[in-house]
């Protein structure tokens, strides 16, 4: 039975008054289309308003309701009282000689880093999912910051929104539009699934950023139970940060391996790609090259054996230096030899180009500009 019109209006007014009294406006950046449908219905508006406002936010990078020309004056005034479109502010910008840009974004007294990497045929945005990281990978600068907290969905989305807005505003500089997004910044994405999934839904939504699922990559150190859950929630490309050919080495450089070993990670990943359309039947394996740690000829053959039943492609990553750790990157000859062995055995392999190393924006170097505040751990020697 439908409620009388007068009663319906009273309920809507009560809801709006509640927003006004608490003086807590809802930040709609980072809200999925479904969440916005519910919101507009609750305040007595048609659900298509959700699609309109998403177009303004994610296609035109508008954060001011008063500029949304297809909203009536009454609706604008109504929304101004109950919503906000907040995004993170920039603390600093660094531009590399190779065109890579690193933005440090401020979150209260903390910050996160986001990296824009232009290439010939595409431009990739590397975003963060946490402030710091709890996994303590020995070769990664973020782990030396320690873990602060998960980013919420608006903070994840804000990185993309900000980067796309800058590129749009600087069109005279001919910056390439972002074509790919990788969750390879600060933090372990799969330990923040609650906020990651809504953010990815917005990235994929045609009323959001509208990117293809094959252009979104989640990189994980290997949280096996969450990989199993992921396929039921979202379908995007998955990359496993393996970085070792056996559990003995991986236990030393990636302590999470003591909980989720290589076998369990690869089995979970194999199951994920079996139902994923985004991955085209192959999982990406990331392998950082550490001198005398995991780069010997015997390690290449161990890796081949480890992956013999896993449809995959391997990305060899030269290690990028940061303070307090005495690792060294494998030299070119070692990396090239490792590469040739993998190729010879039929494994699709690439060597990642080092980008943004001069501004500490390369793989493994992101630390949120807090490296000087870190409790300096013992130097790692092997």
Curated annotation (Swiss-Prot):
Q: What is this protein called?
A: Dual-specificity RNA methyltransferase RlmN
- Cofactor: bound how, per the entry note? Binds 1 [4Fe-4S] cluster. The cluster is coordinated with 3 cysteines and an exchangeable S-adenosyl-L-methionine.
**Record function comment:** Specifically methylates position 2 of adenine 2503 in 23S rRNA and position 2 of adenine 37 in tRNAs. m2A2503 modification seems to play a crucial role in the proofreading step occurring at the peptidyl transferase center and thus would serve to optimize ribosomal fidelity.
One GO BP annotation of this record = rRNA base methylation
Q: Which domain of life is it from?
A: Bacteria
**Annotated residues for binding of [4Fe-4S] cluster:** 133, 137, 140
Primary site of residence:
cytoplasm
Extra remark beyond the main annotation: Reaction proceeds by a ping-pong mechanism involving intermediate methylation of a conserved cysteine residue.
**HAMAP family (UniProt xref):** RNA_methyltr_RlmN (MF_01849)
Family the entry assigns: Belongs to the radical SAM superfamily. RlmN family.
Name of the encoding gene: rlmN
Task: Tell me the cofactors it needs.
Answer: [4Fe-4S] cluster
What is this enzyme's EC?
Answer: 2.1.1.192
Annotated active site = 113 (proton acceptor), 363 (s-methylcysteine intermediate)
């Amino acid at each position: 039975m439908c409620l009388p019109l007068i009663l319906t209006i009273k309920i809507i007014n009560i809801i709006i008054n509640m927003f006004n009294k608490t003086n807590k406006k809802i930040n709609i950046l980072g809200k999925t289309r479904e969440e916005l449908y519910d919101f507009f219905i609750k305040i007595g508006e048609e659900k298509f308003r959700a699609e309109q406002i998403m177009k303004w936010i994610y296609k035109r990078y508008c954060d001011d309701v008063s500029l949304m020309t297809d909203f009536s004056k009454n609706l604008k005034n109504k929304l101004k009282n109950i919503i906000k479109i907040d995004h993170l502010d920039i603390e600093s910008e660094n531009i590399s000689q190779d065109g890579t840009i690193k933005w440090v974004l401020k979150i209260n007294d903390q910050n996160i880093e986001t990296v824009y990497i232009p290439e010939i045929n595409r431009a990739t945005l590397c975003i963060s999912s946490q402030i710091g990281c709890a996994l303590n990978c020995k070769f990664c600068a973020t782990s030396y910051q320690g873990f602060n907290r998960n980013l919420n969905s608006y903070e994840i989305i804000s990185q993309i929104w900000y980067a796309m807005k800058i590129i749009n505003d600087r069109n005279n500089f001919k910056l390439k539009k972002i074509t790919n997004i990788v969750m390879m910044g600060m933090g372990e994405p799969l330990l923040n699934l609650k906020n990651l999934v809504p953010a990815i839904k917005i990235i994929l939504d045609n009323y959001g950023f509208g990117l293809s699922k094959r252009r979104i990559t989640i990189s994980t150190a290997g949280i096996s139970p969450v990989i199993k859950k992921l396929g039921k929630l979202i379908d995007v490309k998955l990359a496993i940060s393996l970085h070792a050919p056996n559990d003995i080495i991986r236990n030393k450089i990636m302590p999470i391996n003591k909980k989720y070993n290589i076998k369990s990670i690869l089995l979970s990943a194999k199951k994920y790609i079996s139902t994923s359309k985004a991955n085209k039947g192959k999982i990406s394996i990331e392998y950082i090259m550490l001198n005398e740690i995991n780069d010997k000829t015997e390690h290449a053959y161990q890796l081949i054996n480890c992956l013999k039943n896993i449809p995959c492609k391997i990305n060899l990553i030269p290690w990028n230096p940061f303070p307090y750790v005495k690792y060294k990157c494998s030299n070119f000859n070692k990396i090239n030899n490792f590469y040739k062995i993998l190729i010879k055995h039929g494994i699709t392999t690439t060597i990642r180009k080092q980008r943004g190393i001069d501004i500490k924006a390369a793989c493994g170097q992101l630390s949120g500009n807090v490296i000087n505040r870190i409790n300096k751990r013992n130097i790692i020697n092997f």
